[in-house]
């Protein structure tokens, strides 16, 4: 009974609830027309504003169901800002490095706060600032106080470096770097070359004068026992005595003839000079054949004249007076002519000196058997020499002067002939060919410089000037 009562109640509830739709029905005609109107027609402005404000509110106050996503987005924004800031810092640092290499270290130290800017070095009273010179000024273009060097200081510094390293290639290396960096032009390079050459010449002359004015002291073995070797050269008289009385005086062998860097620079016939003269086979063969001490003076003079002529040809090619081919042809003729004439002259002088030192023995006669007559002849000869010693001395001095003058004229005769040959082979015919004023000035400067260095005698220099001034 109870079961039937319950079933009736369920049936009543089902009937009252209405028809149940198992599948959704499509919207009516009104809904479809509204949808088409929304697609085709523009919505009212008020609706658009309201919808935009609703979207803004949703973005401003996100739902609490996704707190982690909002946190992640804020973290990403912070990382992006940091990355941009670091990138800008790096770009600024690179620009500062490119713009001023000297301030590179200061910019890096300012950007990095963890560095102490070398406080121990700055507050160390034992250091004078020279220890940091290499670090702060690697190129050496600034003074100790940080101010940049002037043009004269740079020229003097380059000349000093060439003088210290004894290498002409130092200037070429420096100029090539400056040209590659675009810091100077070709004309400025030529101007710098002239200024450096002038400064170097003044420096060499100054050092040579200081070297000559310094007191010269002879050194012996007893003075050098403590290991201290003086830099001064022994007097010339002691050296000459060492050559003349080497077998008789044993103390001369204890005398040291030392040479410092200045003497090596002023010596015109070093190994590197011989390397330059190897391109002239005849002349080089002549130099290697001259080894005697007596001919050392002639050898120095010969090398000086040859190198002066080589520089003269280089200058003519540089100024466009002659072509490089003509310069090469001139040097070939110069090599052959000077070598041949000098060799003949030296051989003649050698035979004359040998005949004076070793005269031919006279034929024996009956008078030589008489010792009394021989002793009488010797005494008479000695008396005659003592009677008029002044005349003999004057004649000897005159003979030496004539002999030296003859050698000099022999050397310079080769120069005169080669210059005449050079004039005959002139092919340009311009009015400015063979600018003799420039040539005379150059030769005069070189001759004076060689006289100051002690390479040439004053008479030889005057003879060279006289020949070039007579052209």
Curated annotation (Swiss-Prot):
GO CC aspect terms: extracellular region; secretory granule membrane; transport vesicle membrane
Biased composition (Basic and acidic residues): 28-45, 106-142, 214-231, 345-355, 363-405
Phosphoserine: residues carrying this PTM: 40, 365
Signal sequence coordinates: 1-22
Its membrane topology: Peripheral membrane protein
Tissue-wise expression: Expression restricted to the brain and pituitary gland. Not detected in the adrenal gland.
Region annotated Disordered, chain positions: 24-73, 92-145, 208-231, 345-405
Location of this chain's protein in the cell: Cytoplasmic vesicle, Secretory vesicle; Cytoplasmic vesicle, Secretory vesicle membrane; Secreted
Glycan attachment points: 40
Keywords for the protein's UniProt record, in alphabetical order: Cleavage on pair of basic residues, Cytoplasmic vesicle, Glycoprotein, Membrane, Phosphoprotein, Proteoglycan, Secreted, Signal
One GO BP: protein localization to secretory granule
UniProt biased composition (Low complexity): 62-73
InterPro entries in UniProt: SCG3
Pfam family membership, one: SGIII
Source domain of life: Eukaryota
Subunit text: Interacts with CHGA. Interacts with secretogranin II/SCG2. Interacts (via C-terminus) with CPE.
UniProt cross-references to PANTHER family, sorted A to Z: SECRETOGRANIN III, SECRETOGRANIN-3
The protein's role, per its UniProt record: Member of the granin protein family that regulates the biogenesis of secretory granules. Acts as a sorting receptor for intragranular proteins including chromogranin A/CHGA. May also play a role in angiogenesis. Promotes endothelial proliferation, migration and tube formation through MEK/ERK signaling pathway.
Protein name: Secretogranin-3
């Amino acid at each position: 009974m109870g079961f039937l009562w319950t079933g009736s109640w369920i049936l009543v509830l089902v009937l009252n609830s209405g028809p149940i739709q198992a599948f959704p029905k499509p919207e009516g005609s009104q809904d479809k027309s509204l949808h088409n109107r929304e697609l085709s027609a523009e919505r009212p402005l008020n609706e658009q504003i309201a919808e935009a404000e609703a979207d803004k509110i949703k973005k401003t106050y996100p739902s609490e169901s996704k707190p982690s996503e909002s946190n992640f987005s804020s973290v990403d924004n912070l990382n992006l800002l940091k990355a941009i800031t670091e990138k800008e810092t790096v770009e600024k640092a690179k620009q500062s490095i490119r713009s001023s290499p000297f301030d590179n270290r200061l910019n890096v130290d300012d950007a990095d706060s963890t560095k102490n800017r070398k406080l121990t070095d700055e507050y160390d009273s034992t250091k004078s600032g020279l220890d940091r010179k290499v670090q702060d000024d690697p190129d050496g273009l600034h003074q100790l106080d940080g101010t940049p060097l002037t043009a004269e200081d740079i020229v003097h510094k380059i000349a000093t470096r060439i003088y210290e390293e004894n290498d002409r290639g130092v200037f070429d290396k420096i100029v090539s770097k400056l040209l590659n960096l675009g810091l100077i032009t070709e004309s400025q390079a030529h101007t710098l070359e002239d200024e450096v050459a002038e400064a170097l010449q003044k420096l060499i002359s100054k050092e040579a004068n200081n070297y000559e004015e310094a007191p010269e002291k002879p050194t012996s073995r007893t003075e050098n026992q403590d290991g201290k070797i003086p830099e001064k050269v022994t007097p010339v008289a002691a050296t000459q005595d060492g050559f003349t009385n080497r077998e008789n005086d044993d103390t001369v062998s204890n005398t040291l003839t030392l040479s410092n860097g200045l003497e090596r620079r002023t010596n015109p016939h070093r190994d590197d000079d011989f390397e330059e003269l190897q391109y002239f086979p005849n002349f080089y063969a002549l130099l290697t054949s001259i080894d005697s001490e007596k001919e050392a003076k002639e050898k120095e003079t010969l090398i000086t004249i040859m190198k002066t002529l080589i520089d003269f040809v280089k200058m003519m090619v540089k100024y466009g007076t002659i072509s490089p081919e003509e310069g090469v042809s001139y040097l070939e003729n110069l090599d052959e002519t000077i070598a041949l004439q000098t060799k003949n002259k030296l051989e003649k002088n050698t035979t004359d000196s040998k005949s004076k030192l070793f005269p031919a023995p006279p034929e024996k006669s009956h008078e030589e058997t008489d010792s009394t007559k021989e002793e009488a002849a010797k005494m008479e000869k000695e008396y005659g020499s003592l009677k008029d010693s002044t005349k003999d001395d004057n004649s000897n001095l005159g003979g030496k002067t004539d002999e030296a003058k003859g050698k000099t004229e022999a050397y310079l005769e080769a120069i005169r002939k080669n210059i005449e040959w050079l004039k005959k082979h002139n092919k340009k015919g311009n009015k400015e060919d063979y600018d003799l004023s420039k040539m005379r000035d150059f030769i005069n400067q070189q001759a004076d410089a060689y006289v100051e260095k002690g390479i040439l005698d004053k008479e030889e220099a005057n003879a060279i000037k006289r020949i070039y001034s007579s052209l």
